[in-house]
Amino acid sequence: MALIAKTRPQAALVLADGTVFQGESTGAAGLTVGEVVFNTSMTGYQEILTDPSYTGQLVTLTCAHIGNVGVNPEDMESNAIHAAGLIVKAAADVPSNWRARQSLPEALKDAGVKAICGIDTRALTIHLRTTGAQAGAIIAKQMGDELTDEDLQQALEAARSWGSMAGQDLAKTVTTDHVYDWTDGSWEPSREGEPAGFRRAAVFPYHVVAYDFGIKTNILRLLADRGIRVTVVPAQTPFEEAMKHQPDGIFLSNGPGDPAPCTYAIEVAHKAIAAK
């Protein structure tokens, strides 16, 4: 059985500066646009894709072969794929891991996420490193349809009209819409008669309020591993409202977009520092 499909639909990545990389689609068909960035991690593609911090970005993974271990529900950093698109050299269609529930291409298609493979990601990364992050568009065709000059022009126009991350407040688009408590720790394999799963501390001597500006579940798990019960609140929660939970501390998560327009977050930080 082939681990990588021999035939895929045609696709292209078009940068705002006019640079074109033609390859093949390994996700959903259609057009997507965003800021083209790269990540040099050797592992963790599922965590990267589901990290809310990558909202609005087309993520290039420099590791040459992506998708070997498939996708599973335990390694999600949120409840959905947040990256606007994925760019890889080679994508595995058949995963090889006992935890896998789907292949990466299947997960991308189910989520409607556009992705391109078969391009020189090293050349793209060097180009981005030299010119800086810029907007781009992935256009992916249906199987059997030809990629045309009109498609490339459409992608170029979409990339050039997208703009940049500057001034975009994306935190309020990815934050939770309700308050919730978190006590699940990190996932561990079975040991000493215990089944595999998420661990939970016996006691929680500390309580922290975490502001969700695009928080990853792994951050919450690591806090829980240390005996910290976390109350997660929406990004625009007033500081005074957060303090009604009587926490031992305040945690401000990272998130997507430009922090400058997030005046509500800046105000919380100022008040938390002043409160000591």
Regions found by a protein language model. Name each.
Residues A2-H245, G257-P259, E267:
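RNA-binding accessory domains that recognize and position tRNA/RNA substrates
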Residues K244, D248-G249, N254-K276:
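Cysteine-nucleophile active-site neighborhood
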